[in-house]
Amino acid sequence: MAVKIRLTRMGSKKKPFYRINVADSRAPRDGRFIETVGTYNPLVAENQVTIKEERVLEWLSKGAQPSDTVRNLLSKAGVMTKFHDQKFSK
């Protein structure tokens, strides 16, 4: 089972709000998911992002692949550098 970390669209028409979910790659975008690991609100001036770092690092270490947008959000939050350091420090 290929697992991805990707965005799920929530909110109403013209006012998107996203959840950062861990889901099977074959599941629909807004369909079944395994776990919610964060949120992303692009409408706020500073693009409010909340991330459960421990859970994201655990899923990345298990082999979950982030989507391009999620990878950018994780990089800006500093999670990808922590994952890189954790992976190559051994």
From Swiss-Prot:
GO terms for biological process: translation. The keyword Ribosomal protein applies. InterPro entries: Ribosomal_bS16, Ribosomal_bS16_dom_sf. One of its GO terms (molecular function) is structural constituent of ribosome. Keywords: Ribonucleoprotein, Ribosomal protein. One of its GO terms (cellular component) is cytoplasm. The keyword Ribonucleoprotein applies. Gene3D superfamilies: 3.30.1320.10. SUPFAM superfamilies: Ribosomal protein S16. Belongs to the bacterial ribosomal protein bS16 family. This is Small ribosomal subunit protein bS16. It comes from Streptococcus agalactiae serotype V (strain ATCC BAA-611 / 2603 V/R). The lineage of its organism: Bacteria, Bacillati, Bacillota, Bacilli, Lactobacillales.
